[in-house]
Amino acid sequence: MSQSRNKKSALSLDIKTLSALAYRLGLPEEVLISESRKAGCYYQPFISIPKPAPFAKRSLKVKKRAIDNPTDPLKFIQNRIYKRLLQPLLWPEHIYGGVKGKSLIMNVTPHLSANVIVTLDIKSFFPTVTTFQVYNVWSELLGCSPTIAGLLTRLTTFERHLPQGASTSSALANLVLYSIDQPIRDYCREKDILYTTWIDDLAFSGEQSRRVINVAVEALRNSGFAAPHRKLRIMPAHDRQFLTGLLLNRQPGILREYMSATRSGIYKLATGCVPLSGSKRYVRGVEGRIAYIRMVNPRRAKPLELSLAYTLEDTRV
């Protein structure tokens, strides 16, 4: 029975009745109805102002982010929706971000050794996605009945937008973009341009990839989204090419600045430049950076791991 609930499906759900939805989610019908009516009451919004890591450049602007933190029982229901409805979908090949089994490495690999790489960022993607767009995803794209689409929209949106912090939001953001980017996909297919997405990061590569910029910007603008010019990057092969924080060109790699900052972090630990009050957080930050490097290039991560281990042994942080 559980296998049929979680069976891989195409980009369609075709849920027409409340009883079918309740079965797929393994939840009582009355719970879905009652919680959808008061879903907005279960959020605890806050503004996230991340403290810069001690090894980060102090001049970097700290980015504030509004988090629409969902709590139980809504959080539990959203997790069910993600795991049983959204995660099992057969996602289009060009969508990478937020898709189980896909990684940053997989996202950048198709663009390796490209003559030109173009990247665009969608500004404030989650807050700009509307309830109407989410409803259309459930209804038009995934084939749910109007009643079911409305119920699922109430369970997965907050104050008329896609909530940052909900487990369903990345998948729904992917689907919203997929529902509006047909002109982009068609143009890329026609001009033999490789196109991939990582949530709000769009990447294009190929001889004619520069030509897709106007098409992409117009398609996004027509659906209420913006792609700031300052976030547009055109990277020919003779320049340094990078995507979602990874260095490209011949093979995926770590940006030089990232490696340097990580080594600097270990050095500051070794020389006692880190206040005792912040040492645990600092070490976690360095460990996180090394884990990221290990994912991309285990060989380059090994010396950093050893250096950090020796440092921690000597300083006993």
Stretch-by-stretch model annotation:
Residues 1-57, 62-120, 125-147, 151-166, ...:
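Right-hand nucleic-acid polymerase module
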Residues 187:
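Short alpha-helical functional segments enriched in proximate histidine and acidic residues
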Residues 119-123, 165, 169, 190-206:
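Catalytic palm active-site di-aspartate
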